Amino acid sequence: MLTWLTQFSPHFQPLNLFRYITFRTGGATATALFFVFFFGPRIIAALRIKQGKGQPIRLDGPQSHLLTKKGTPTMGGLMILSGLIVSTLLWANLRNHYVWVVLFVTTGFGLIGFYDDYLKVSKQSHKGFPGRIRLLLEVGIAGAACYAMMLLGTPHTTSLAFPAINGFAVDLGLFFLVVGPFVIVSAGNAVNLTDGLDGLAIVPVMIAAGTFGVIAYLAGNAIFSTYLGINFVPGAGELSVVTGAVIGAGLGFLWFNAPPAQIFMGDTGSLALGGLLGAVAVAVKHEIVLAIVGGLFVLETLSVIVQVISFKLTGRRVFKMAPIHHHFEQLGWSEPQVVVRFWIIAFVLALIGLSTLKLR
């Protein structure tokens, strides 16, 4: 929105700063951070009153959680999403269709997560939105977003690029409408599965957002993309502003979500943020790199899949508990140990993901 101020730059030179993506990304980060800082306590207080008993704690989870997390309100994703959306609308170029597509996915997934959280809190049960209906809605939203990208994007919007291989990509054609939604829906649910400990999901989300902010900036620049041998995606650089808003809102939320958490992000936040990461990855044509950068989310998801398949086929569990962060809790790791070590893994994976830009 603030980009319109650039038309007055001939009369006041500093307004020319609003032309630069890097400046607006910093502004989006700061705005989202202060928004969540300011409104966070008010939102937490309101949710605590509305929810009463807070998020129901699973009886089949770690027993310590029944004591340490009981009564904590959920739906903290409202803090993140409100800060993220307000900041994006303020600092991004609203004529950029990628911004609107990503916000569409984020808001849509956030609404699904919100309804899921509402059902869990109102019924005081871990059973929320019926899985099949929820998945169908996610696929519908992701499919609509990918279709919009096809209509508004470039000729290589439907291509799938492979990291570390210069210029090699496969044109998916209409199959893009299968692969794209799969990436977005998978990312949303993977982050959702990871959100099981105080601060565990939000920091890896911020790390991934920062990484894809860099990738979006490079992919949206004709000179940098040509030099690196990656697809040039006109307008993709504007998504750096969105990822900057994610980082700012995430930092603000972490202030209240640090152990012991005053609030949980719930499905409202985790599903929306995961969907956002997936949508950005699809938009900038680095879907496979997302699996590297978000490798922690992939690991959490695979641990659940392996656990379910193993138990159904053999009656035995591979892990003491799934997702895998609970497995390490059962091994005797304290919650802060699990969280910080997983943060380290996420940071290392982000560095590996970024390195693929030069390994070509």
Curated annotation (Swiss-Prot):
Task: List, separated by semicolons, the cofactors it needs.
Answer: Mg(2+)
- First-level EC class: transferase
Q: Which domain of life is it from?
A: Bacteria
The GO terms this record gives for MF are:
metal ion binding; phospho-N-acetylmuramoyl-pentapeptide-transferase activity; UDP-N-acetylmuramoyl-L-alanyl-D-glutamyl-meso-2,6-diaminopimelyl-D-alanyl-D-alanine:undecaprenyl-phosphate transferase activity
Location comes to: Cell inner membrane
Note the CDD domains from the entry.
GT_MraY (cd06852)
Q: In which pathway does it act?
A: Cell wall biogenesis; peptidoglycan biosynthesis
User: What EC number(s) is this enzyme filed under?
Assistant: 2.7.8.13
Residue stretches spanning the membrane: 27-47, 74-94, 99-119, 135-155, 165-185, 199-219, 236-256, 263-283, 288-308, 337-357
What positions belong to coiled-coil segments? Answer: none
Main subcellular location: membrane
Q: One GO cellular component from the entry? A: plasma membrane
One of the GO biological process terms: cell division
Pfam families xref list: Glycos_transf_4, MraY_sig1
Q: Which NCBIfam families match?
A: mraY
Official protein name in the record: Phospho-N-acetylmuramoyl-pentapeptide-transferase
